[in-house]
């Protein structure tokens, strides 16, 4: 067998290691890229060598495989953050797209993941053949229904800690043809083998691309020839031990070389490269703005850290003396959230103006103080408006100067307007706030006392600058009701996400008193809203506010557009005029509209949630889902579309006669067993949303991460898919669907599949509830099912984007049956061609056929025929058959398993004499007809007369039967009337085996349960005699661990041999029944180490007894050991009770059947069978016990096993096998027979671990054994010297047999 190379990837990967030099003049560094919608957008990657940031490729619904053909970016070798692929249609592999992508650094991660491949409907393999390292972060590969070759990737070679990877929901491994190069007939040299997650296997990306496994220490990279790269290289190199020939750098890169640290005068940037101070100074966080980059502790940072600052004359960060001055140039910055305020953390000097507009929130002062508490100077103005969440301005605890370089409306340096809950100005008075120029303005602050404002005037030095209208006593600190006028709305226009409002013009007595309007609006399911605009009981603002400036023309009606609204939602709206009164004694004039209720128009719903499926028959699928999170209308029905998927034709390329067949399943989703939740139930609560989780209630980190990841992708859907295509107009993929190409352009694509799926019609149905039953489907076939949610406006807005699931129907029981009869024709000497028709409508694909054929009077042989081999001839050639009469039958194996056997077809192979007679017959046909008839009649008369005289029985001797051939009844004879048959147990090598009762067989027992062996009714006298001679061998055996002969019934028909009843059958069947997936599992646990050693001891004891009696077994295997009711294992009765395990035997050169997988090399080479060769077989039996009766040398044909063992090969070491058993097997498989232990020596090594009962019952502890020690056969005996009388048994044949 070929030995895999440690670095086979160099021979089979089309990797072009570019000699880029890594200088900035040759390496193109690209920023983060978000490529979506159009395949042409991928051209942005054309010259990129490194993506400094993330690379996202997503939402290409109209792309096809042709669009990606020829598209390749071989220059790209590194992504510094993460790589994400999401819903890119038509892309089948990343192999050509990124052939040289070697490193994903994971500097910044996507929810903890460095590589994300999510819902890629046509991706068949990942295939990043050059990928050598994912430095940080996990891998998430999920919901890719065609994605295979995941089981052959060793993620441990790429990641330091692959345990957090999340790889679920992809194509079932059983349905994939995951074969690596050089394995099971695949082209190329074998890939390297590694162990990952407890599984040792060949490692590859595809069937033609191995995964790189470098033979270098400490995870070093290597060249294509397997030579070790420099220690600073990562992902490979073009020359060994050269830091300038690396594909990527392990640490840092500068001017074409990979380095451990940046050289003097350069600084680390983005964790992977070095830049000069000049280069760092030229970088910009925000294009168009002055650079804020600084150098600190050898790194080029986007901003100096806390406690450090930089000045205009130096790029280096310096430690502050005292309070760290930090100048922040902001222009005019609006702070409308805590997040926006965090941009000013650490700022002491704000160059620009601040506008505070904090409308929602609870207890914000501590958080605002963290962000704004160090501000001492504002060079422009400070405007605080509509900040209902503010109670105090104390968070500006260090504010000393508002300089007024810029002013509100050219007049006001401090402008405080409409803050309904503002009560305190904080420490401004104590701190001595100075406003050197401009006025202050306070209006509509009903809770702010005037005395605070007047005191501020004195401290800031602004008293006398402003008039009474600018600090109006009627709108500050005064909760008294004002005289107001009613405003009327004159028009409103609603859309799905906006409302356009207009109201009548309002003119107060003094036109200059009207400042602006404020529109208040909020969701209001019921028409019970009040005009209270302060914070609600939870501390948050219930109304949304929108400032409306006065129209430029006095004749124009004011209006506004409320945007970003929810579809099909009722809103409460009112408008209020903001006025002031210039005359102190005049009444307050104001205006306000009544509350009106408006509903937005419907829109397409979001996608249905949590779709699951199951199959309850071969023609039905059941699908269930949950309603969409946003219905955007009255949900009226769901549109369900389904299409049959073509089976993967690549499965035909595998020879399943040699490769293990793992079948796809159609198991029910366990969630179907749960009770249905009420999809209409809505969460209702009269309480405020909690700011912190209740004590003791902690969301598990994994669940929290799962929920966060799912939410992130839902955001993708909502942000990128504006309105879905109207799928309800699609009836067949062969028709031309009429779709709106305008506003629906960027929607999620309709159901469209790759491969031959387009040959199958798309079907649809409308269902009113969250479930559907799909009927009339093809058996054992995979379907894609799309579910769209549709509301009452679907005829205008369309239905939702699709959520989809893949499901497979159950198999049809009779679909894999072969129609008609099997035909045959002679093709050449000793050869026939068997032909049959394929099943017309199988369960999925037909993968192989099995032919069971037998020569009359011999055991059956099973031949496996791959689908490709069948396709060449429409059948199979059976060659090198000995002359005789044969029968054969055939069955097919599909994706669903085995079909039924056909009826037997009879055929014959002519012998040499018959062929000569046939030639003579041809010659005689040329003679006159009369002569021909005369000769034929004479011959018939002659043979008829001979037949009447006597019947011939073939014998090797001239006499028909010698005295030694006859069976003579003795003391073992049991009268037939004492025997009664109860039931059939199975087929033995001579005939049927029954369970029965024998009366008077044992003293003190009225009846004894026994096993009864019979010969077939058509057996010849010779076969009956051989049957009785097999039984006679056991008359001399009396050992607890050898199955006992109890008697013989030789008088009359049928001949019976009475044996000890072993109720649990043979050891092979018993072990297989203990597998967890076994259908006949008796509910027993798998055997522990002590039980395995007990089985081994009992078998060794029985074999030690046979060896002491000079008996060589020749066919020791689990199938020939029997298990009693109390689980004692005994050596079987030497071929008589063996079940017909045809595949365990091999016919070598037309001779008898040989158990080659259990035979020692000397037996295979020279036909030598000794106790030593039995010890070899015992080692294989140990291997069977550990593996629960797997087939030895699985994956190799009998011919390959024959050559492998004769060339010195042995079975591989088992993963997780106890060391004691593994060492014992190794001793049994010594190439030199004399170095193998005897069975008594084997018992010596394990006697301490055997049960106490073993000492009482075993041969090993008997006086006979002690006397027999030293006289065991140790020389290589020729087969004919063995005392066994079974000279004609094919298992015992030596040379010449």
From Swiss-Prot:
Domain of life of the organism encoding this protein: Eukaryota
Active site annotation, chain numbering: 1115
Residue ranges occupied by any Fibronectin type-III domain in the UniProt entry: 483-603, 607-707, 818-913
Keywords from the named record: ATP-binding, Cleavage on pair of basic residues, Disulfide bond, Glycoprotein, Kinase, Membrane, Nucleotide-binding, Phosphoprotein, Receptor, Repeat, Signal, Transferase, Transmembrane, Transmembrane helix, Tyrosine-protein kinase
Swiss-Prot/TrEMBL GO biological process terms: actin cytoskeleton organization; cell surface receptor protein tyrosine kinase signaling pathway; cellular response to alkaline pH; insulin receptor signaling pathway; male sex determination; protein autophosphorylation
Biased amino acid composition, Acidic residues: 675-685
Ranges of Polar residues composition bias in the record: 1281-1297
Ranges that cross the membrane: 922-943
Binding site for ATP: 985-993, 1013
Cystine residue pairs: 214-222, 216-228, 229-237, 233-246, 249-258, 262-274, 280-300, 304-317, 320-324, 657-864
Residues annotated with Phosphotyrosine modification: 1145-1146
Enzyme kind, highest EC tier: transferase
Segments on the Extracellular face: 747-921
PROSITE patterns according to UniProt: FN3, PROTEIN_KINASE_ATP, PROTEIN_KINASE_DOM, PROTEIN_KINASE_TYR, RECEPTOR_TYR_KIN_II
GO CC terms, sorted: axon; insulin receptor complex; plasma membrane; receptor complex
Annotated membrane topology: Single-pass type I membrane protein
Record's subcellular location: Membrane
PTM (free text): Autophosphorylated on tyrosine residues between pH 7.9 and pH 10.5.
Glycosylated residues (UniProt): 47, 311, 411, 492, 528, 616, 634, 756, 885, 898
Signal sequence segment: 1-26
Disordered: annotated segments: 666-687, 732-758, 1267-1297
Catalytic activity: L-tyrosyl-[protein] + ATP = O-phospho-L-tyrosyl-[protein] + ADP + H(+)
Family: Belongs to the protein kinase superfamily. Tyr protein kinase family. Insulin receptor subfamily.
Function according to Swiss-Prot or TrEMBL: Receptor with tyrosine-protein kinase activity. Functions as a pH sensing receptor which is activated by increased extracellular pH. Activates an intracellular signaling pathway that involves IRS1 and AKT1/PKB.
Protein's recorded name: Insulin receptor-related protein
């Amino acid at each position: 067998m070929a030995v895999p190379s440690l670095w086979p990837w160099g021979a089979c990967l089309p990797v072009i290691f570019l000699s880029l030099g890594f200088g900035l003049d040759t390496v193109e560094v690209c920023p983060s890229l978000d490529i979506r919608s159009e395949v042409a957008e991928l051209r942005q990657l054309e010259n990129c060598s490194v993506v400094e940031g993330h690379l996202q490729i997503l939402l290409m619904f109209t792309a096809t495989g042709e669009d990606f053909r020829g598209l390749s970016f071989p220059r790209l070798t590194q992504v510094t953050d993460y790589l994400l692929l999401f819903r890119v249609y038509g892309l089948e592999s990343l192999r050509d797209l990124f052939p040289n992508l070697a490193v994903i650094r994971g500097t910044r991660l996507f929810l903890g993941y460095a590589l994300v491949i999510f819902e890629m409907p046509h991706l068949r393999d990942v295939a990043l053949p050059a990928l050598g390292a994912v430095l940080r972060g996990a891998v998430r590969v999920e919901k890719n229904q065609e994605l295979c070759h995941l089981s052959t990737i060793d993620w441990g070679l790429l990641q330091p800690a692959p345990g957090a990877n999340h790889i679920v929901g992809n194509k079932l491994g059983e349905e994939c043809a995951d074969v690596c190069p050089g394995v099971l007939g695949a082209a190329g040299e074998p890939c390297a083998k590694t162990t990952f997650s407890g599984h040792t296997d060949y490692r590859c990306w595809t069937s033609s691309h191995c995964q790189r496994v470098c033979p270098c220490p400490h995870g070093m990279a290597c060249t294509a020839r397997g030579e070790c790269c420099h220690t600073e290289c990562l992902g490979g190199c073009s020359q060994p031990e050269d830091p300038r020939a690396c594909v990527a750098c392990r640490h840092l890169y500068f001017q074409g070389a990979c380095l451990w640290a940046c050289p003097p005068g350069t600084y680390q940037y983005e964790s992977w490269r070095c830049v000069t101070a000049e280069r760092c100074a030229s970088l910009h966080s925000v294009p168009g703005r002055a650079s804020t980059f600084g150098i600190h502790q050898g790194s080029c940072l986007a901003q100096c850290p806390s406690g450090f600052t930089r000045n205009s004359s130096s790029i280096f960060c310096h430690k502050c003396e005292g309070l760290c001055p930090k100048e922040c140039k902001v222009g005019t910055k609006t702070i409308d959230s805590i997040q926006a305020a965090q941009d000013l953390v650490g700022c002491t000097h704000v160059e620009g103006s601040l506008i505070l507009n904090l409308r929602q929130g609870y207890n914000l002062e501590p958080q605002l103080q963290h962000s704004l508490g160090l501000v001492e100077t504002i060079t422009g103005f400070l405007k605080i408006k509509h900040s209902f969440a503010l109670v105090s301005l104390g968070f500006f605890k260090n504010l000393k100067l508002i300089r007024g370089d810029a002013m509100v409306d050219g007049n006001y340096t401090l402008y405080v307007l409409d803050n309904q809950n503002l009560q305190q100005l904080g420490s401004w008075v104590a701190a001595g706030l100075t406003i050197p120029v401009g006025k202050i303005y306070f209006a509509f602050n009903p809770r702010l006392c005037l005395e605070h404002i007047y005191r501020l005037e004195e401290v800031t030095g602004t008293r006398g600058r402003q008039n009474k209208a600018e600090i109006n006593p009627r709108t500050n600190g005064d909760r008294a009701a004002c005289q107001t006028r009613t405003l009327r709305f004159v028009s409103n226009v609603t859309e799905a996400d906006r409302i356009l409002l207009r109201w009548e013009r309002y003119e107060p007595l003094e036109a200059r008193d009207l400042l602006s309007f404020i529109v208040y609006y909020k969701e209001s399911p019921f028409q019970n809203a009040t005009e209270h605009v302060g914070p609600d009981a939870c501390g948050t603002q219930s109304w949304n506010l929108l400032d409306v400036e006065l129209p430029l023309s006095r004749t124009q009606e004011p209006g506004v557009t409320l945007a970003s609204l929810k579809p099909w939602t009722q809103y409460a709206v009112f408008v209020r005029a903001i006025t002031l009164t210039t005359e102190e004694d005049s009444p307050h004039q104001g205006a306000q509209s009544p509350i009106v209720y408006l509903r937005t128009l419907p829109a397409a719903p979001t996608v249905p949630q949590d779709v699951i499926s199951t199959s309850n028959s071969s023609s039905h699928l059941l699908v269930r889902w949950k309603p969409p999170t946003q219905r955007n209308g009255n949900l009226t029905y769901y549109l369900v579309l389904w299409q049959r998927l073509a089976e993967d034709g690549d499965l035909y390329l595998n020879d399943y006669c040699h490769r293990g067949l793992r079948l796809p399943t159609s198991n029910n989703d366990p969630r179907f067993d749960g009770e249905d939740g009420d999809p209409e139930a809505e969460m209702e609560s009269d309480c405020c949303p909690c700011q912190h989780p209740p004590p003791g209630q902690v969301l598990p980190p994994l669940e929290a991460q799962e929920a966060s990841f799912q939410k992130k992708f839902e955001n993708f859907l909502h942000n990128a898919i504006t309105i879905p295509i109207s799928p309800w107009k699609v009836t067949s993929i062969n028709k031309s669907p009429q779709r709106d190409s305008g506003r629906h352009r960027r929607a999620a694509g309709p159901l469209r599949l790759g491969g031959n799926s387009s040959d199958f019609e798309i079907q649809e149905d409308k269902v009113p509830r969250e479930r559907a039953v799909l009927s009339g489907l093809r058996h054992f076939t995979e379907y894609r099912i799309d579910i769209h949610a549709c509301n009452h406006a679907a005829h205008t807005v369309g239905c939702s984007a699709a959520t989809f699931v893949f499901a497979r129907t159950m198999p049809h029981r009779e679909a894999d049956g072969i129609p008609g009869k099997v035909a045959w024709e002679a093709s050449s000497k000793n050869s026939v061609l068997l032909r049959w028709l394929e099943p017309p409508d199988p369960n999925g694909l037909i993968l192989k056929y099995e032919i069971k054929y037998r020569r009359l009077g011999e055991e059956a042989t099973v031949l496996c025929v791959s689908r490709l081999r069948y396709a060449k001839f429409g059948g199979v050639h059976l060659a090198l058959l000995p002359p005789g009469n044969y029968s054969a039958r055939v069955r097919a194996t599909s994706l669903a398993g085995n079909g039924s056997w056909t009826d037997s077809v009879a055929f014959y192979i002519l012998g040499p004499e018959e062929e000569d007679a046939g030639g003579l017959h041809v010659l005689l046909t040329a003679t006159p007809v009369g002569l021909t008839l005369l000769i034929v009649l004479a011959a018939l008369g002659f043979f008829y007369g001979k037949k009447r005289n006597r019947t011939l029985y073939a014998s090797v001797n001239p006499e028909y039967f010698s005295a030694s051939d006859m069976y003579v009844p003795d003391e073992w004879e049991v009268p037939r009337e004492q025997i009664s048959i109860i039931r059939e147990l199975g087929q033995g090598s001579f005939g049927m085996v029954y369970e029965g009762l024998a009366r008077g067989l044992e003293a003190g027992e009225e009846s004894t349960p026994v096993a009864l062996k019979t010969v077939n009714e058509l057996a010849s006298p010779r076969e009956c005699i051989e049957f009785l001679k097999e039984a006679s061998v056991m008359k001399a055996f009396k050992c607890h661990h050898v199955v006992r002969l109890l008697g013989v019934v030789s008088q009359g028909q049928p001949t019976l041999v009475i044996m000890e009843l072993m109720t649990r059958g043979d050891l092979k069947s018993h072990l297989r029944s203990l597998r967890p997936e076994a259908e006949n599992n008796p509910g027993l646990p798998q055997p522990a180490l002590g039980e395995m050693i007990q089985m081994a001891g009992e078998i060794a004891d029985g074999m030690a007894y046979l060896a002491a009696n000079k008996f060589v077994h020749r066919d020791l295997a689990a199938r020939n050991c029997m298990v009693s009711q109390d689980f004692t294992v005994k050596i079987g009765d030497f071929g008589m009770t063996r079940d017909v395990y045809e595949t365990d035997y091999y016919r070598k050169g037309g001779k008898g059947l040989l158990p080659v997988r259990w035979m020692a090399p000397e037996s295979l080479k020279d036909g030598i069978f000794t106790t030593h060769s039995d010890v070899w077989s015992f080692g294989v039996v140990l291997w069977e016990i550990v593996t629960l009766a797997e087939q030895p040398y699985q994956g190799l044909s009998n011919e390959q096993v024959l050559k492998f063992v004769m060339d010195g090969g042995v079975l591989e070491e088992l993963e997780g096998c106890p060391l004691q058993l593994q060492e014992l097997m190794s001793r049994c498989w010594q190439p030199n027979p004399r170095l193998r232990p005897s069975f008594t020596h084997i018992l010596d090594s394990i006697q301490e671990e055997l049960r106490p009962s073993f000492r009482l019952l075993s041969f090993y502890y008997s006086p006979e054994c002690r006397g027999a020690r030293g006289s065991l056969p140790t020389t290589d005996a020729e087969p004919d010297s063995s005392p066994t009388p079974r000279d004609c048994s094919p298992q015992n044949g030596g040379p010449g047999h």
